[in-house]
């Protein structure tokens, strides 16, 4: 049976995600920004937390681990390259590993750039990509620990996934991302359509996630830094993708 996925808010603008296998009863939380909303979502559904899949070591993604571990004795799965930054880790994973959540399979992709230890979890059978702070809808994460070329390569890893893959990202930043992207590609019809959709969703108080990766490939300027229209939009006609991506990210940092 397909995974059941629940989306809710943690902290100010983090997304909380539960991924449930109804056949086995196993449930994973993608990251653990804070415990209370995750425990509340579990209680609403009548689910038991069996796993936390950690994407990276930033505090707003791991702050609830200790309380959740104490409450549920769940397994904590985390990237291998993080030293002691992530607490109570039971299983460390790297590129190509597959984590079992009951009968569900989560494939690990290393996506460094935002942090050096960042990973994404891909549920191929369920067409679900949990990209955390590497790829946002119509945006990408800041480059805190890695380099711009490293982050671009990580985005390319995600871009090759199927168009019907659903993107679940780390934060509700989509409205701000759309505003910035329209300064680069104001005449992109896919971006214009996404802008209208996002405005409707936010007015209704609804999350802008999930979105389809195929739509992101057409509308997200950060995924399209190798497109001539994006290069022209930042006055770098003829420049290489890394140079264009760097300019995009630095402009977004200042916006």
Curated annotation (Swiss-Prot):
Listed CDD domains: hydroxyacylglutathione_hydrolase_MBL-fold (cd07723)
Catalytic reactions of this protein: an S-(2-hydroxyacyl)glutathione + H2O = a 2-hydroxy carboxylate + glutathione + H(+)
GO BP: methylglyoxal catabolic process to D-lactate via S-lactoyl-glutathione
Listed pathway(s): Secondary metabolite metabolism; methylglyoxal degradation; (R)-lactate from methylglyoxal: step 2/2
Keywords: Hydrolase, Metal-binding, Zinc
UniProt family annotation: Belongs to the metallo-beta-lactamase superfamily. Glyoxalase II family.
Record EC number: 3.1.2.6
One Pfam family of this chain: HAGH_C
Record note on quaternary structure: Monomer.
One annotated GO molecular function: metal ion binding
Superkingdom to which the source organism belongs: Bacteria
Enzyme class: hydrolase
Function summary: Thiolesterase that catalyzes the hydrolysis of S-D-lactoyl-glutathione to form glutathione and D-lactic acid.
Cofactor note: Binds 2 Zn(2+) ions per subunit.
Residues holding Zn(2+) 2: 60-61, 133, 171
UniProt-recorded name of the protein: Hydroxyacylglutathione hydrolase
Binding positions (Zn(2+) 1): 56, 58, 114, 133
The keyword Metal-binding is annotated on this UniProt entry: yes
Names of required cofactors: Zn(2+)
């Amino acid at each position: 049976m397909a995974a059941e996925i629940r989306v809710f808010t943690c902290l100010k603008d983090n997304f909380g995600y539960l991924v449930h296998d109804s056949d086995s009863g196993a449930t994973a939380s993608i990251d653990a920004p804070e415990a209370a909303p995750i425990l509340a979502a579990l209680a609403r559904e009548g689910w038991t937390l069996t796993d936390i899949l950690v994407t990276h070591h930033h505090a707003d993604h791991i702050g609830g681990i200790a309380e959740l571990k104490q409450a549920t004795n769940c397994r904590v799965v985390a990237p291998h390259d993080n030293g002691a930054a992530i607490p109570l880790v039971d299983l460390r994973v790297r590129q190509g590993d597959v984590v079992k959540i009951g009968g569900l399979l989560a494939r690990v992709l290393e996506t460094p750039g935002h942090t050096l230890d960042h990973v994404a979890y891909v549920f191929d059978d369920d067409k679900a990509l949990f990209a955390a702070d590497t790829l946002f809808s119509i945006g990408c994460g800041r480059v805190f620990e890695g380099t711009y070329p490293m982050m671009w390569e990580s985005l390319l890893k995600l871009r090759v996934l199927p168009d019907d893959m659903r993107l679940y990202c780390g934060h509700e930043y989509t409205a701000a991302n759309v505003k910035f992207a329209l300064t680069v590609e104001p005449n992109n019809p896919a971006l214009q359509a996404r802008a209208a959709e996002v405005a409707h969703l936010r007015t209704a108080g609804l999350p802008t996630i999930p979105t389809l990766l195929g739509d992101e490939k057409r509308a997200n300027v950060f995924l399209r830094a190798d497109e001539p229209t994006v290069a022209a939009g930042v006055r770098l006609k003829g420049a290489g993708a890394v140079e264009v991506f760097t300019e995009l990210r630095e402009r977004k940092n200042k916006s």
